[in-house]
């Protein structure tokens, strides 16, 4: 059973309002940096791949961070970071207060194939914030923020456990 099927089952019977990602999260591009500009350090530089491109001495994002690769073969690849990082050839999704970051991450991970299909461009494919901004995200109990966050938290707990098993 796919993660979306699980998410749909977990939301079954709950009032849900679908909102565009762009209306409930900040989509922010990274800062361009080349290997020659990097000052050797321990901060992962997250660019267009599945692993850090290199390591730098400063970060431009802290805490729980959702990153979507912006170009190349892995454009659209979603990753999760819980440490300071330097986002380069990618963009981040920072949910507003009505959406838990990890809930948003699970939803985007479920859409991984669709995100890859957003690629456009000639030689080097790209995925842009404008491509993912219209994605609809289910917000449970939208009129009761505390209940909404509690439901999201429980869904995250279950999906984290499910993901750890697969």
What residue ranges belong to the model's regions?
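Charged, alpha-helix-forming regions
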Residues: 1-166
